[in-house]
C-alpha cells in the first residue's frame, strides 16, 4: 500500500468499526482502492479488519451497483451559462470546465465573482468521495468572498467523478501519486491563465484526501503562494521545508490519526521562512468542515473559514 491507500483504508476501517459503514461497502472499497480482491483482503488485514469473508460475500460486495436515475457528478459539456473551456473566458458565474491535461482531459468547476475585476485564484481539492455538490458549493462561497475558485476533479483520468462514491474513491486510491501531482500542477497553470485571476501565484485548499494533495501541491508547484490543508496527511514531511507557500494547516483535536502529524508539520513549516501556522480545533473530528456529514462542527467550521479567508487575502 502507498501512503494514500493506507490513509483511505484506515479511514474506512474506522467507519466500519463505528458501524457507519457496512462490511459489504468496506469490502467493495478495499478491492477498488487496491485493484484486486487479494490485494483488497490483504489491505483489510493490514488495518485490522481482516475476516473470514465467504467467496459469495466477496462476489456480492464487488459487484458494481445497479444503475439509477441519479445524475453523474462528472463534468458535462459547457452550457451557455457555463465557464468555457478556454482560460480566456469572460463568462461570469459558475460552470463546468474541461481542458487538456498531462494524461487526460481534466475536469473541474469554476466560480467567479459576479463583478468583473482582478481576483486571487484558489484551487479547491475535494474529499475522497470525488468532486460533488458540496465541493462546488465551497467554490461558490469563495466567489462570493471575492476569489476566482476552481474545484478540481482528481478523478478526471477515470472519466470524472460519478454518483458512485466508492468508485470515485477507488479511482483516487489506485491512481499513481505522481499522476495526481502532475494534474494538480496542470490545474495551477490553468487557473493562472483564467481571465481575471491575479498574476503572481494562487492559493490551494482541500479536505481529507484533498488536504494531503494540498501539501503535495505546496511542495511541487511554485505557483502556489498560499496553502490551507484541512485534516490532510503530509506524505513528504522531509520535503515540506522546501515549500515556497505560506501554509495554514488545520486539524481537529479528535482526529488522532491525522492530527498526530501536526507537531512534525509545524516544525518543518517553521524552516520555510514563509508565514505558517498550525491550528487545532478542540472538540472537532475529521471532516468537521463538511456541513453535509455527521462530523460537522459548526463553530469550528465557521472559525476555520474566517481564518482561511484571512490567510488567502494576506498571502495570495
Where are these regions (language model features)?
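Serine-hydrolase catalytic machinery in alpha/beta-hydrolase-like enzymes
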Residues: 15, 22-32, 58-70, 88, ...
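Primarily recognizes the serine-hydrolase "nucleophile elbow" in alpha/beta-hydrolase
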Residues: 186-243
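Short beta-strand/loop motif that positions the catalytic acidic residue
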Residues: 249-251
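Conserved alpha/beta-hydrolase "acid-adjacent" motif
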Residues: 256-262
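C-terminal catalytic histidine-bearing segment of alpha/beta-hydrolase fold enzymes
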Residues: 275-316
Amino acid at each position: 500500500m502507498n501512503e494514500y491507500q493506507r490513509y483511505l483504508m484506515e479511514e474506512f476501517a474506522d467507519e466500519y468499526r463505528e458501524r457507519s459503514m457496512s462490511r459489504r461497502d468496506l469490502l467493495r472499497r478495499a478491492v477498488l482502492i487496491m485493484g484486486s480482491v487479494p490485494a483488497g483482503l490483504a489491505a483489510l488485514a493490514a488495518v485490522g479488519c481482516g475476516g473470514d469473508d465467504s467467496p459469495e460475500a466477496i462476489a456480492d460486495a464487488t459487484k458494481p451497483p445497479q444503475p439509477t436515475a441519479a445524475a453523474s457528478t462528472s463534468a458535462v459539456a459547457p452550457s451557455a451559462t457555463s465557464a468555457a473551456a478556454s482560460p480566456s473566458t469572460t463568462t461570469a458565474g459558475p460552470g463546468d470546465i474541461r481542458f487538456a491535461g498531462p494524461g487526460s482531459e481534466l475536469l473541474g468547476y469554476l466560480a467567479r465573482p459576479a463583478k468583473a475585476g482582478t481576483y486571487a485564484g484558489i484551487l479547491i481539492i475535494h474529499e475522497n468521495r470525488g468532486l460533488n455538490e458540496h465541493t462546488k458549493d465551497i467554490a461558490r462561497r469563495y466567489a462570493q468572498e471575492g476569489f476566482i475558485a476552481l474545484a478540481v476533479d482528481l478523478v478526471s483520468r477515470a472519466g470524472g467523478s460519478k454518483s458512485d462514491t466508492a468508485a470515485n474513491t477507488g479511482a483516487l486510491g489506485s491512481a499513481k501519486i505522481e499522476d495526481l501531482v502532475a494534474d494538480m500542477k496542470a490545474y495551477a497553470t490553468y487557473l493562472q491563465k483564467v481571465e481575471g485571476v491575479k498574476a503572481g501565484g494562487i492559493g490551494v485548499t482541500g479536505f481529507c484526501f484533498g488536504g494531503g494533495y494540498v501539501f503535495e501541491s505546496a511542495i511541487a508547484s511554485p505557483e502556489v503562494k498560499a496553502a490551507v490543508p484541512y485534516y490532510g496527511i503530509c506524505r513528504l514531511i522531509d520535503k515540506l521545508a522546501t515549500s515556497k507557500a505560506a501554509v495554514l494547516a488545520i486539524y481537529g483535536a479528535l482526529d488522532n490519526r491525522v492530527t498526530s502529524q501536526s507537531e512534525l508539520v509545524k516544525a518543518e513549516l517553521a524552516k520555510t521562512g514563509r508565514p505558517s501556522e498550525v491550528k487545532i480545533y478542540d472538540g472537532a473530528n475529521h471532516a468537521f468542515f463538511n456541513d453535509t456529514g455527521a462530523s460537522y462542527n459548526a463553530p469550528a467550521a465557521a472559525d476555520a473559514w474566517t481564518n482561511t479567508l484571512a490567510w488567502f487575502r494576506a498571502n495570495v
